[in-house]
Regions:
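Short, structured segments at the rim of ligand-binding sites
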Residues: 1-172
Length: 172
């Protein structure tokens, strides 16, 4: 089973309603049937894809932005990956503040080799954000290898970016 925070929150909500689900936060859920479910109150997690998209948008537009109530602890490695792209931000409580930044530079490894960003099952990087990282990288100083491992053909829009002047090498 998927174990992203969204699945975890759904399982916890169902348990509060009377379900019997164990193995939450693992890749194996065990569900015991129950006669009925009751009601509960629940607050949905913010969409981590939207949060990542707004971080990328602020960086590319060199704009100051505060993203409120991001559920920072449930973003996994997303903030760290943006930091590796050279994007400065601050965690302010449960908000992310991105200051105006004239440019950003992709980190390289200590030996000078190119940084790699790759998608992976949770707690790895969600594949839905790879396209955001790719577009953000077109405006950065430096180089990055973006490796799409989980799905085929999701980055085939790069030919359009190349037509607009992006320096991208697509390997299949």
């Amino acid at each position: 089973a998927a174990c992203e925070p969204y699945i975890q929150q759904l399982c916890r909500m169902l348990n509060r309603m009377g379900a019997r689900i164990s193995g939450i936060a693992s890749n194996l859920l065990t569900i015991e049937g129950v006669e009925s479910l009751g009601g509960t109150e629940h607050t949905m997690l913010p969409d981590m894809i939207e949060v990542g998209s707004f971080i990328g948008m602020a960086a590319m537009n060199q704009s100051e932005l505060t993203i409120r109530n991001v559920s920072y602890d449930n973003l996994g490695i997303i903030p760290a990956q943006f930091a590796r792209m050279g994007i400065r931000f601050e965690q302010r409580g449960d908000d992310i503040y991105i200051p105006e930044q004239g440019h950003y530079s992709i980190e390289s490894f200590i030996d000078g080799s190119i940084m790699t960003i790759a998608d992976a099952p949770w707690p790895g990087l969600t594949p839905d954000l790879l396209s955001i990282f790719l577009v953000v990288a077109t405006q950065a100083k430096g180089a990055v290898l973006i490796h799409q491992k989980m799905f085929e053909s999701r980055l085939f829009f790069v030919d359009k970016l190349i037509d607009m002047g992006a320096r991208i090498m697509l390997c299949d």
